[in-house]
Amino acid sequence: MENKSPSKKNKPPSCGSLVTILSLDGGGVRGIIAGVILAFLEKQLQELDGEEARLADYFDVIAGTSTGGLVTAMLTVPDETGRPHFAAKDIVPFYLEHCPKIFPQPTGVLALLPKLPKLLSGPKYSGKYLRNLLSKLLGETRLHQTLTNIVIPTFDIKKLQPTIFSSYQLLVDPSLDVKVSDICIGTSAAPTFFPPHYFSNEDSQGNKTEFNLVDGAVTANNPTLVAMTAVSKQIVKNNPDMGKLKPLGFDRFLVISIGTGSTKREEKYSAKKAAKWGIISWLYDDGSTPILDITMESSRDMIHYHSSVVFKALQSEDKYLRIDDDTLEGDVSTMDLATKSNLENLQKIGEKMLTNRVMQMNIDTGVYEPVAENITNDEQLKRYAKILSDERKLRRLRSDTMIKDSSNESQEIK
Protein backbone atom coordinates (compact mmCIF):
# COMPACT_ATOMS: atom_id res chain seq x y z
CA MET A 1 0.00 0.00 0.00
CA GLU A 2 1.38 3.38 -0.96
CA ASN A 3 2.08 5.55 2.09
CA LYS A 4 1.90 9.20 1.25
CA SER A 5 3.16 10.81 4.43
CA PRO A 6 2.40 14.50 4.82
CA SER A 7 5.30 16.75 3.85
CA LYS A 8 4.93 20.17 5.45
CA LYS A 9 7.15 23.19 4.96
CA ASN A 10 6.82 24.60 8.48
CA LYS A 11 9.54 23.84 11.01
CA PRO A 12 8.15 21.28 13.51
CA PRO A 13 7.50 21.78 17.24
CA SER A 14 10.77 19.93 17.98
CA CYS A 15 12.56 23.09 16.80
CA GLY A 16 10.56 25.39 19.06
CA SER A 17 8.89 25.64 22.45
CA LEU A 18 5.17 25.36 21.60
CA VAL A 19 2.57 23.40 19.66
CA THR A 20 0.31 25.89 17.88
CA ILE A 21 -3.31 25.09 17.03
CA LEU A 22 -6.04 27.08 15.28
CA SER A 23 -9.57 25.71 15.64
CA LEU A 24 -12.61 26.87 13.64
CA ASP A 25 -16.22 26.04 14.54
CA GLY A 26 -19.03 25.14 12.17
CA GLY A 27 -21.98 27.45 11.62
CA GLY A 28 -22.94 27.81 7.96
CA VAL A 29 -23.10 31.43 6.79
CA ARG A 30 -21.90 32.49 10.24
CA GLY A 31 -18.44 31.48 9.04
CA ILE A 32 -18.22 35.13 8.01
CA ILE A 33 -17.73 35.95 11.70
CA ALA A 34 -14.64 33.75 11.86
CA GLY A 35 -13.43 35.26 8.57
CA VAL A 36 -13.37 38.74 10.10
CA ILE A 37 -11.36 37.55 13.11
CA LEU A 38 -8.90 35.54 11.01
CA ALA A 39 -8.28 38.51 8.72
CA PHE A 40 -7.41 40.62 11.77
CA LEU A 41 -5.01 37.99 13.13
CA GLU A 42 -3.26 37.54 9.79
CA LYS A 43 -2.90 41.31 9.44
CA GLN A 44 -1.12 41.44 12.81
CA LEU A 45 1.28 38.72 11.66
CA GLN A 46 1.94 40.64 8.44
CA GLU A 47 2.78 43.77 10.41
CA LEU A 48 5.36 41.73 12.30
CA ASP A 49 6.77 39.58 9.49
CA GLY A 50 5.81 41.12 6.15
CA GLU A 51 2.94 41.06 3.66
CA GLU A 52 3.61 37.48 2.56
CA ALA A 53 2.84 36.08 6.02
CA ARG A 54 -0.08 33.63 6.05
CA LEU A 55 -1.81 31.82 8.91
CA ALA A 56 -0.65 28.44 7.61
CA ASP A 57 2.94 29.55 8.25
CA TYR A 58 2.35 29.78 12.01
CA PHE A 59 0.12 26.89 13.05
CA ASP A 60 1.14 23.25 13.41
CA VAL A 61 -2.51 22.28 13.05
CA ILE A 62 -5.52 24.08 11.62
CA ALA A 63 -8.76 22.27 12.47
CA GLY A 64 -12.20 23.06 11.13
CA THR A 65 -15.69 21.62 11.19
CA SER A 66 -18.37 22.21 8.55
CA THR A 67 -17.97 25.84 7.42
CA GLY A 68 -14.78 25.85 9.50
CA GLY A 69 -13.52 22.94 7.43
CA LEU A 70 -14.05 24.96 4.28
CA VAL A 71 -12.07 27.87 5.75
CA THR A 72 -9.35 25.43 6.82
CA ALA A 73 -9.00 24.28 3.22
CA MET A 74 -8.92 27.86 1.93
CA LEU A 75 -6.04 28.66 4.28
CA THR A 76 -3.97 25.53 3.65
CA VAL A 77 -4.46 24.30 0.08
CA PRO A 78 -1.55 25.53 -2.08
CA ASP A 79 -1.85 27.53 -5.27
CA GLU A 80 0.43 27.04 -8.27
CA THR A 81 3.26 28.91 -6.49
CA GLY A 82 3.11 26.71 -3.40
CA ARG A 83 1.56 29.37 -1.18
CA PRO A 84 -1.94 29.31 0.39
CA HIS A 85 -4.72 29.55 -2.18
CA PHE A 86 -6.43 32.24 -0.10
CA ALA A 87 -5.28 34.93 2.29
CA ALA A 88 -7.45 35.36 5.39
CA LYS A 89 -8.71 38.69 4.05
CA ASP A 90 -10.28 36.80 1.12
CA ILE A 91 -12.63 34.74 3.31
CA VAL A 92 -15.34 37.36 3.90
CA PRO A 93 -15.55 38.42 0.21
CA PHE A 94 -15.71 34.73 -0.72
CA TYR A 95 -18.67 34.17 1.61
CA LEU A 96 -20.44 37.32 0.45
CA GLU A 97 -20.15 36.17 -3.17
CA HIS A 98 -20.94 32.47 -2.85
CA CYS A 99 -23.27 32.00 0.15
CA PRO A 100 -26.33 33.34 -1.73
CA LYS A 101 -25.73 30.64 -4.36
CA ILE A 102 -24.96 27.88 -1.84
CA PHE A 103 -28.07 28.77 0.17
CA PRO A 104 -30.45 30.19 -2.47
CA GLN A 105 -33.32 32.08 -0.87
CA PRO A 106 -36.87 31.60 -2.22
CA THR A 107 -38.33 34.65 -3.93
CA GLY A 108 -41.75 35.76 -5.13
CA VAL A 109 -44.58 33.27 -4.65
CA LEU A 110 -42.14 30.55 -3.53
CA ALA A 111 -41.20 32.62 -0.50
CA LEU A 112 -44.82 32.47 0.66
CA LEU A 113 -45.11 28.70 0.47
CA PRO A 114 -44.62 26.59 3.62
CA LYS A 115 -41.07 25.19 3.93
CA LEU A 116 -42.05 22.04 5.81
CA PRO A 117 -43.24 19.98 2.78
CA LYS A 118 -39.87 20.54 1.11
CA LEU A 119 -38.00 19.33 4.21
CA LEU A 120 -40.15 16.20 4.37
CA SER A 121 -39.39 15.27 0.77
CA GLY A 122 -35.63 15.84 0.79
CA PRO A 123 -32.82 18.15 1.92
CA LYS A 124 -33.47 21.88 1.94
CA TYR A 125 -30.70 22.51 -0.63
CA SER A 126 -29.38 20.35 -3.44
CA GLY A 127 -25.75 21.14 -2.63
CA LYS A 128 -24.90 21.12 -6.34
CA TYR A 129 -23.42 24.62 -6.38
CA LEU A 130 -21.28 23.91 -3.30
CA ARG A 131 -19.97 20.65 -4.75
CA ASN A 132 -19.08 22.25 -8.08
CA LEU A 133 -17.49 25.25 -6.37
CA LEU A 134 -15.27 23.18 -4.10
CA SER A 135 -14.28 20.80 -6.89
CA LYS A 136 -13.24 23.76 -9.03
CA LEU A 137 -11.41 25.66 -6.28
CA LEU A 138 -9.60 22.75 -4.64
CA GLY A 139 -9.14 20.59 -7.72
CA GLU A 140 -7.22 17.35 -7.24
CA THR A 141 -5.40 18.50 -4.10
CA ARG A 142 -5.25 15.68 -1.56
CA LEU A 143 -4.91 15.68 2.19
CA HIS A 144 -1.15 15.08 2.20
CA GLN A 145 -0.59 18.19 0.07
CA THR A 146 -1.88 20.86 2.47
CA LEU A 147 0.69 23.41 3.61
CA THR A 148 0.31 22.57 7.28
CA ASN A 149 -1.38 19.75 9.15
CA ILE A 150 -5.16 19.88 9.11
CA VAL A 151 -7.84 18.07 11.10
CA ILE A 152 -11.43 17.99 9.80
CA PRO A 153 -14.14 15.91 11.54
CA THR A 154 -16.97 14.21 9.64
CA PHE A 155 -19.45 11.47 10.54
CA ASP A 156 -19.91 8.29 8.49
CA ILE A 157 -23.60 7.35 8.62
CA LYS A 158 -22.98 3.84 7.24
CA LYS A 159 -20.43 2.96 9.92
CA LEU A 160 -22.20 5.13 12.52
CA GLN A 161 -18.90 6.54 13.72
CA PRO A 162 -16.80 9.66 13.22
CA THR A 163 -14.27 9.80 10.41
CA ILE A 164 -11.55 12.29 11.27
CA PHE A 165 -9.47 13.44 8.32
CA SER A 166 -6.11 14.24 9.87
CA SER A 167 -2.80 14.84 8.15
CA TYR A 168 -1.12 12.91 10.96
CA GLN A 169 -3.41 9.91 10.47
CA LEU A 170 -2.05 9.41 6.95
CA LEU A 171 1.04 7.92 8.56
CA VAL A 172 -1.00 4.86 9.56
CA ASP A 173 -4.06 5.01 7.28
CA PRO A 174 -3.26 6.08 3.70
CA SER A 175 -6.88 5.41 2.69
CA LEU A 176 -7.71 8.81 4.22
CA ASP A 177 -5.57 10.58 1.61
CA VAL A 178 -8.62 11.74 -0.29
CA LYS A 179 -9.30 14.94 -2.19
CA VAL A 180 -9.70 17.93 0.10
CA SER A 181 -12.80 18.91 -1.87
CA ASP A 182 -14.47 15.63 -0.83
CA ILE A 183 -13.55 16.26 2.80
CA CYS A 184 -15.07 19.74 2.69
CA ILE A 185 -18.27 18.57 1.01
CA GLY A 186 -18.59 15.80 3.61
CA THR A 187 -18.02 17.95 6.68
CA SER A 188 -20.53 20.52 5.34
CA ALA A 189 -23.34 18.03 4.63
CA ALA A 190 -25.59 19.13 7.49
CA PRO A 191 -28.58 16.78 7.90
CA THR A 192 -31.82 18.29 6.51
CA PHE A 193 -29.80 21.05 4.78
CA PHE A 194 -27.63 19.09 2.30
CA PRO A 195 -27.57 15.48 1.09
CA PRO A 196 -24.92 13.17 2.60
CA HIS A 197 -21.75 12.90 0.55
CA TYR A 198 -20.70 9.53 -0.86
CA PHE A 199 -17.34 8.92 -2.51
CA SER A 200 -14.67 6.24 -2.60
CA ASN A 201 -10.89 6.25 -2.59
CA GLU A 202 -8.60 3.65 -4.13
CA ASP A 203 -5.00 3.13 -3.06
CA SER A 204 -2.06 2.02 -5.20
CA GLN A 205 -2.87 -1.64 -4.49
CA GLY A 206 -6.44 -1.29 -5.74
CA ASN A 207 -7.98 -1.41 -2.27
CA LYS A 208 -11.19 0.62 -2.20
CA THR A 209 -12.48 2.57 0.79
CA GLU A 210 -15.99 3.99 0.78
CA PHE A 211 -17.19 7.06 2.66
CA ASN A 212 -20.79 8.02 3.50
CA LEU A 213 -20.42 11.36 5.23
CA VAL A 214 -22.52 13.98 6.94
CA ASP A 215 -21.63 17.20 8.71
CA GLY A 216 -18.75 16.97 11.17
CA ALA A 217 -20.81 19.11 13.54
CA VAL A 218 -22.69 16.03 14.75
CA THR A 219 -19.29 14.81 15.96
CA ALA A 220 -17.51 17.97 17.07
CA ASN A 221 -18.89 21.34 16.01
CA ASN A 222 -15.95 22.80 17.92
CA PRO A 223 -12.91 20.74 16.83
CA THR A 224 -10.46 22.06 19.44
CA LEU A 225 -10.11 18.83 21.43
CA VAL A 226 -10.04 16.74 18.25
CA ALA A 227 -7.00 18.72 17.12
CA MET A 228 -5.32 18.49 20.54
CA THR A 229 -5.91 14.74 20.58
CA ALA A 230 -4.40 14.36 17.10
CA VAL A 231 -1.21 16.02 18.33
CA SER A 232 -1.17 14.02 21.57
CA LYS A 233 -1.34 10.76 19.62
CA GLN A 234 1.80 11.78 17.74
CA ILE A 235 3.58 12.52 21.00
CA VAL A 236 2.62 9.07 22.35
CA LYS A 237 3.92 7.49 19.13
CA ASN A 238 7.23 9.35 19.52
CA ASN A 239 6.90 11.28 16.29
CA PRO A 240 10.29 13.04 16.05
CA ASP A 241 8.54 16.25 14.97
CA MET A 242 7.18 16.54 18.53
CA GLY A 243 10.61 16.57 20.14
CA LYS A 244 10.54 16.05 23.92
CA LEU A 245 6.89 16.97 24.42
CA LYS A 246 5.04 14.86 27.00
CA PRO A 247 1.74 13.12 26.11
CA LEU A 248 -0.28 15.36 28.43
CA GLY A 249 1.96 18.39 28.09
CA PHE A 250 -0.88 20.74 27.17
CA ASP A 251 0.94 23.56 28.97
CA ARG A 252 3.11 23.68 25.84
CA PHE A 253 0.07 24.10 23.57
CA LEU A 254 -1.01 27.49 22.25
CA VAL A 255 -4.62 27.29 21.08
CA ILE A 256 -6.82 29.86 19.36
CA SER A 257 -10.41 28.63 19.07
CA ILE A 258 -12.85 30.73 17.03
CA GLY A 259 -16.60 30.28 17.24
CA THR A 260 -19.34 31.49 14.92
CA GLY A 261 -21.78 32.68 17.56
CA SER A 262 -24.65 30.94 19.31
CA THR A 263 -28.15 31.63 20.58
CA LYS A 264 -27.78 30.43 24.17
CA ARG A 265 -29.13 33.64 25.66
CA GLU A 266 -32.06 33.80 23.26
CA GLU A 267 -33.54 30.72 24.94
CA LYS A 268 -35.36 29.65 21.77
CA TYR A 269 -36.64 26.39 23.21
CA SER A 270 -38.13 25.25 26.51
CA ALA A 271 -39.48 22.05 28.02
CA LYS A 272 -42.95 23.57 28.05
CA LYS A 273 -42.72 24.44 24.35
CA ALA A 274 -41.29 21.08 23.31
CA ALA A 275 -43.52 18.93 25.53
CA LYS A 276 -45.98 18.22 22.72
CA TRP A 277 -43.47 18.02 19.88
CA GLY A 278 -43.43 14.96 17.66
CA ILE A 279 -40.88 13.99 15.02
CA ILE A 280 -41.85 16.82 12.67
CA SER A 281 -41.58 19.57 15.27
CA TRP A 282 -38.15 18.38 16.38
CA LEU A 283 -37.07 18.67 12.75
CA TYR A 284 -38.70 22.02 12.02
CA ASP A 285 -39.85 24.87 14.25
CA ASP A 286 -40.36 28.37 12.92
CA GLY A 287 -37.48 28.16 10.45
CA SER A 288 -35.12 26.31 12.80
CA THR A 289 -34.15 22.66 13.18
CA PRO A 290 -34.28 22.09 16.96
CA ILE A 291 -32.65 18.66 17.01
CA LEU A 292 -29.71 19.95 14.96
CA ASP A 293 -29.39 23.15 17.01
CA ILE A 294 -29.28 21.15 20.23
CA THR A 295 -26.75 18.64 18.90
CA MET A 296 -24.39 21.32 17.61
CA GLU A 297 -24.66 23.60 20.64
CA SER A 298 -24.07 20.77 23.11
CA SER A 299 -21.03 19.62 21.13
CA ARG A 300 -19.35 23.03 20.95
CA ASP A 301 -20.18 23.87 24.57
CA MET A 302 -18.87 20.61 26.04
CA ILE A 303 -15.64 20.84 24.08
CA HIS A 304 -15.06 24.42 25.22
CA TYR A 305 -15.82 23.35 28.79
CA HIS A 306 -13.33 20.47 28.74
CA SER A 307 -10.69 22.61 27.01
CA SER A 308 -11.13 25.27 29.69
CA VAL A 309 -10.73 22.68 32.45
CA VAL A 310 -7.53 21.30 30.89
CA PHE A 311 -5.82 24.67 30.57
CA LYS A 312 -6.98 25.84 34.01
CA ALA A 313 -5.70 22.65 35.65
CA LEU A 314 -2.29 23.32 34.10
CA GLN A 315 -2.46 27.01 35.07
CA SER A 316 -2.08 27.82 31.38
CA GLU A 317 -5.26 29.80 30.74
CA ASP A 318 -3.16 32.43 28.96
CA LYS A 319 -2.37 29.87 26.23
CA TYR A 320 -6.01 29.18 25.35
CA LEU A 321 -8.07 31.88 23.64
CA ARG A 322 -11.70 31.24 22.80
CA ILE A 323 -13.49 33.95 20.81
CA ASP A 324 -17.24 33.53 20.53
CA ASP A 325 -20.54 35.30 21.16
CA ASP A 326 -23.56 33.64 22.77
CA THR A 327 -25.94 36.58 22.30
CA LEU A 328 -27.04 36.05 18.69
CA GLU A 329 -30.76 36.44 18.07
CA GLY A 330 -33.13 36.34 15.12
CA ASP A 331 -31.85 36.21 11.55
CA VAL A 332 -28.13 36.32 12.39
CA SER A 333 -28.47 33.12 14.43
CA THR A 334 -29.53 31.03 11.43
CA MET A 335 -27.05 28.90 9.50
CA ASP A 336 -28.45 29.50 6.05
CA LEU A 337 -30.02 32.95 5.72
CA ALA A 338 -27.81 34.23 2.90
CA THR A 339 -29.49 37.55 2.16
CA LYS A 340 -27.22 40.52 1.52
CA SER A 341 -28.37 42.30 4.67
CA ASN A 342 -27.89 39.27 6.93
CA LEU A 343 -24.41 38.53 5.59
CA GLU A 344 -23.42 42.16 6.14
CA ASN A 345 -24.82 42.02 9.67
CA LEU A 346 -22.72 38.93 10.38
CA GLN A 347 -19.66 40.81 9.20
CA LYS A 348 -20.48 43.61 11.66
CA ILE A 349 -20.89 41.07 14.46
CA GLY A 350 -17.41 39.74 13.72
CA GLU A 351 -16.01 43.26 13.89
CA LYS A 352 -17.79 43.88 17.19
CA MET A 353 -16.49 40.62 18.64
CA LEU A 354 -12.96 41.90 18.12
CA THR A 355 -13.63 44.80 20.47
CA ASN A 356 -15.47 42.68 23.06
CA ARG A 357 -13.68 41.77 26.27
CA VAL A 358 -11.93 38.40 26.40
CA MET A 359 -14.25 35.87 28.01
CA GLN A 360 -13.47 32.63 29.83
CA MET A 361 -15.85 29.90 30.89
CA ASN A 362 -16.45 29.54 34.61
CA ILE A 363 -15.83 25.80 34.97
CA ASP A 364 -18.18 25.61 37.98
CA THR A 365 -21.19 27.26 36.35
CA GLY A 366 -20.49 26.93 32.61
CA VAL A 367 -21.17 30.66 32.24
CA TYR A 368 -18.95 32.97 30.18
CA GLU A 369 -17.23 35.60 32.32
CA PRO A 370 -14.79 38.40 31.41
CA VAL A 371 -11.18 37.75 32.38
CA ALA A 372 -9.80 39.69 35.32
CA GLU A 373 -7.68 41.91 33.09
CA ASN A 374 -9.65 44.48 31.14
CA ILE A 375 -8.45 43.20 27.76
CA THR A 376 -10.31 42.92 24.46
CA ASN A 377 -10.15 40.14 21.87
CA ASP A 378 -8.24 42.28 19.38
CA GLU A 379 -5.65 43.16 22.02
CA GLN A 380 -5.28 39.50 22.94
CA LEU A 381 -4.91 38.52 19.29
CA LYS A 382 -2.09 41.03 18.95
CA ARG A 383 -0.36 39.37 21.90
CA TYR A 384 -0.86 35.92 20.37
CA ALA A 385 0.44 37.17 17.01
CA LYS A 386 3.68 38.24 18.72
CA ILE A 387 4.01 34.83 20.38
CA LEU A 388 3.39 33.06 17.06
CA SER A 389 5.91 35.27 15.28
CA ASP A 390 8.56 34.68 17.95
CA GLU A 391 7.91 30.92 17.89
CA ARG A 392 8.37 30.79 14.12
CA LYS A 393 11.64 32.73 14.33
CA LEU A 394 12.89 30.47 17.13
CA ARG A 395 12.16 27.36 15.08
CA ARG A 396 13.97 28.74 12.06
CA LEU A 397 16.99 29.67 14.17
CA ARG A 398 17.20 26.28 15.86
CA SER A 399 16.62 24.45 12.58
CA ASP A 400 19.44 26.37 10.90
CA THR A 401 21.70 25.63 13.87
CA MET A 402 20.90 21.90 13.75
CA ILE A 403 21.58 21.80 10.00
CA LYS A 404 24.88 23.60 10.52
CA ASP A 405 25.91 21.25 13.34
CA SER A 406 24.97 18.22 11.25
CA SER A 407 27.03 19.56 8.34
CA ASN A 408 30.05 20.10 10.61
CA GLU A 409 29.77 16.55 11.95
CA SER A 410 29.72 15.19 8.40
CA GLN A 411 32.85 17.17 7.56
CA GLU A 412 34.63 15.82 10.65
CA ILE A 413 33.75 12.23 9.72
CA LYS A 414 35.21 12.75 6.24
From Swiss-Prot:
What's a GO cellular component annotated to this UniProt protein?
cytoplasm
Where in the numbering of this chain does the PNPLA domain appear? 22-228
Q: Which residues carry this modification: Phosphoserine?
A: 399
Identify a single GO molecular function assigned to this protein. monoacylglycerol lipase activity
List the Gene3D superfamilies hit by this protein, alphabetically.
Cytosolic phospholipase A2 catalytic domain (3.40.1090.10)
Is the keyword Lipid metabolism assigned to this protein? yes
Q: What happens when the gene is disrupted?
A: Decreased number of lateral roots.
* Cited SUPFAM superfamilies: FabD/lysophospholipase-like (SSF52151)
Cellular localization per UniProt: Cytoplasm
Tell me, what does this protein do in biology? Answer: Possesses non-specific lipolytic acyl hydrolase (LAH) activity. Catalyzes the hydrolysis of the neutral lipids monogalactosyldiacylglycerol (MGDG), digalactosyldiacylglycerol (DGDG) and phosphatidylglycerol (PG), and less efficiently the polar lipids phosphatidylcholine (PC) and phosphatidylinositol (PI), but not the storage lipid triacylglycerol (TAG). May play a role in root development.
UniProt domain comment? The nitrogen atoms of the two glycine residues in the GGXR motif define the oxyanion hole, and stabilize the oxyanion that forms during the nucleophilic attack by the catalytic serine during substrate cleavage.
Q: What is this protein called?
A: Patatin-like protein 1
